[in-house]
Amino acid sequence: MTIEKSLTQGASFPAFANHPGYSRMFAPGRLTMGIFLPLRFYEGDMSVLAGQAALVEEIDRQDFAAVWVRDVPLYDPSFGDAGQVFDPFTYLAFLAARTKRVALATGSTIFSLRHPIDLAKSAFTIDQLSGGRLVLGIASGDRPVEFPAYGVERAERAERFAQAVSYFRQLTQAGQLNIDSPLGRFDTAELLPKPVHGSIPLIVTS
């Protein structure tokens, strides 16, 4: 399998120096600080998550760099915690409406499990609604229970990750597209909206 470098290269400061979210997180010569949700972990009681949105509003006022959320489709108590419980994209859209400056980041979006069209539609929508503040931390996934649940072979996650990143990058391009990928194909169609600044920073995280 050959994947074009231009479609899979990650974020770098020169490429995203004018991106509102990325430039807040990776400011040259500055140490930046953000928060990683949740601050209190779910253990059967949703009330532990109360008040987090108000906290995010406050860190936005206090000039923090970023708020991070996680992509945890299934809670497996034998493996680890449930993250912030809420769907990461729905929750970031909610937080985008309550903030003005803080970068909105995922750590990590599981590209090997989610279809790139759905990923792009959600990501580009949040980027537009937030004024270009979205940064995607991306990963291939590590929770064994999730792969058979999605009908994906865990041993193939690296290849699916690369395929999804390539597909996702192509969807940022303007105009009608012709895409032929192992994950799907279409002719003369376009995914809308597009990211505010033409692309979304992708950062491999774990």
List the predicted regions and their residue ranges:
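N-terminal beta1-alpha1-beta2 module of alpha/beta enzyme domains
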Residues: 2-98, 194-202
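Internal, glycine-rich beta/alpha segment that forms the wall or movable "lid"
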Residues: 4-29, 79, 112-206
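A short, mixed-charge helix-start or loop-turn motif at secondary-structure junctions
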Residues: 37-38, 77-78, 105-108, 150-151
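Active-site beta-loop-alpha junctions enriched in small/polar residues
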Residues: 38-42, 72, 109-111, 139-143
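Alpha-helical structural elements of signaling/regulatory helical domains
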Residues: 47, 101, 153-156
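Active-site-proximal glycine-rich helix-loop-beta segment
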Residues: 63, 100, 130-132
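Hydrophobic residues within beta-strands of alpha/beta enzymes
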Residues: 67, 104, 134-136
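Alpha-helix-loop-beta-strand connector modules within alpha/beta enzyme cores
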Residues: 82-105, 160-167, 171
